[in-house]
Structure formats: structure tokens, C-alpha cells
């Protein structure tokens, strides 16, 4: 099973675009999620996750969320690879949102 649930805040406004061929909505944003524990100096630790949403969910997220807003995201992890202009291969792990709860 590939399932992840995160609650965090958007680090910047949602980027909404539409694919060229099928005109499908795609939203992308970064979610800052605080860890439950702190460092020894009581400083909070935060993880940052790249999140992608598709179709109507993408449009709703773009409409109702902006920088600093809190959201709960349920989805799956997905790996993606690409080559840059210099031919260097890159890999990334993204969260593919399946549900969003606006908090």
C-alpha cells in the first residue's frame, strides 16, 4: 500500500496550469510540515514536501489555498525522473494528492 497523510502549511501560492494536449488542470505547491519532536535546543524541525494535484482537486486547491494556509493532504508517493538540458539525470519524490481538507 502506498498512502501518505500530511498536515502542513503552504510555503507559497499554488501554481495552477493546464496540460497542452488534454487541457487537464495540474496544481503544484510545497507543504511545510512540522515534526512532532524538536532539536535539543527546542528548535522545531520542519520537512518540506512537493505536492501535485490533478483535475478538479487541482482547481479547488488553487481556488481556496494560498501561502500560509493550513491543509491536510491524503495521497500517495510517486517517484519521477528527468534529464536536464545538460543531460544530467535527476530523480525526485512527490506527493500526488488524492484528497484535501481545508483547515
Regions found by a protein language model. Give the residues of each.
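Single-stranded nucleic acid-binding surfaces, predominantly the OB-fold ssDNA-binding core
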Residues: 1-103
Amino acid at each position: 500500500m502506498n498512502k501518505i497523510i500530511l498536515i502542513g502549511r503552504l510555503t507559497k501560492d499554488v501554481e495552477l496550469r493546464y496540460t497542452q494536449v488534454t487541457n487537464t488542470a495540474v496544481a503544484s505547491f510545497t507543504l511545510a510540515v512540522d515534526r512532532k519532536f524538536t532539536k535539543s535546543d527546542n528548535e522545531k524541525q520542519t520537512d518540506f514536501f512537493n505536492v501535485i494535484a490533478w483535475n478538479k482537486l487541482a482547481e479547488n486547491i488553487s481556488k481556496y489555498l494560498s501561502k500560509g494556509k493550513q491543509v491536510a493532504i491524503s495521497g500517495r508517493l510517486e517517484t519521477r525522473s528527468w534529464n536536464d538540458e545538460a543531460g544530467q539525470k535527476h530523480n525526485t519524490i512527490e506527493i500526488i494528492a488524492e484528497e484535501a481538507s481545508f483547515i
